Structures are given as structure tokens and as C-alpha cells.
Amino acid sequence: MADKHLDARKGDSAHYQIDAAINRIAWAGDPDHNLLGILSTGQNIPTYTITAGGTSGQTSWLKKDADEILQDLMNMYSQVSKSTKNIERPDTLVLPTNIYTALSMKRVGDTADTVLTFIQRNAPFLKKIEMAAELNDDSVETNPYAAASNGSGVALLYTNDQKKLAIHNPMAFLQYPVQVRNLETIVPCEARTAGMIIPFPMSALIAIGV
């Protein structure tokens, strides 16, 4: 371990814990303090329930083929477009980590394409596809639809524009000078967040059951 002053390590630990707490709030909110996350029902972001594919008969994207997944995406995009009279055009898709990994490694038939590259080429409205462990089906701290077993992973389709949605942190992490109390050192730290601010909830969509 690199030589590092104890006070600096305490500060790093506090910074990590505060960042982790803000991240949880950004996704799931904090009902005790009336803070909303992007997946909080109070945000009024529309939801879309994944249905069984016509060929596979499955709902999970782990078991669907590329065409069925693409159809789900088209249905998701169409729901946003129709409900907003084509004003909102989401351009970013965030997937659970296991779904993203599987799609990036699973080939389409005997071609050189993976399911992920197939989607990127055939869904031109998507500028970016990302992954987030917070959306996993067992991420109970950040995904309201998750559970220890038999939970639902979710996908988030949204417009990557801070005018549409953004986390508001009035105070970034602040570390005060070291204080000595009763033969121990104290490193006071604080940060403040207002959670996710989403003026245009119809610009996003939460797909349940991927």
C-alpha cells in the first residue's frame, strides 16, 4: 500500500461514501427526505413492460433474438414519439450490465455481428448504448423493480440533454480541516444533493423486464 497520511485516507473514504450515497439517490431517490431519483415513481417517467417475443416466447433479452430485441426498442421509441407528438426523440439507451455484456458477445447467426452492433446499426436514433449495474435485476438499492431473486432488470431510454434531466448537487464534496477531539482526529466532510431534476419526464422511458 502506498504511503498515505491517515487523514488523507479518511478523507478519501468519506468522499467515496458520500459519492455512493448521492449515486443511490440519483437512481432511486430518498423518500425520507422527499428526494427523487430517475427511477422514482414520483418522476412520472412513462414505463414500458417488455412482452414475449413472437419467435422465442421469452421476455428476457438474454433469451430473445436480435430481431425481437430490435422490435422492443422500436416499440419503446414509438411510445415516446407518439405520446409527445414526435417532439421528444430519445437518443441514449442504458442497460443492466449482464444484458449489455451478453448482447456485446452474442453473435447474430453465422455473421460477424454481435447483437449489440446489429442494434446500433438498425436503430439509427440511438447515439449511445451504455450499461449501469444500478439497473440490474438484483440491485435493490437503486432499482425499485429489483429483488434478491426473480427481480426485474430495467432499461432506460432517454434524451442525453441536461435540459431534460440532470442531477442537481448544490454543494460538491467539501472536506474541512482536520479537527482533534479527545485524542482522535476528525475530518468533517459534507455534500448536498437535490436528487434528479427532470423537467421533461416524457423525454424518457423505463422498460421493465429486460
Regions found by a protein language model. Give the residues of each.
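Alpha-helical scaffold segments that mediate packing/assembly in large oligomeric complexes
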Residues: 1-71
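Extended, solvent-exposed, turn-rich assembly/linker loops in the middle of proteins
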Residues: 39-114
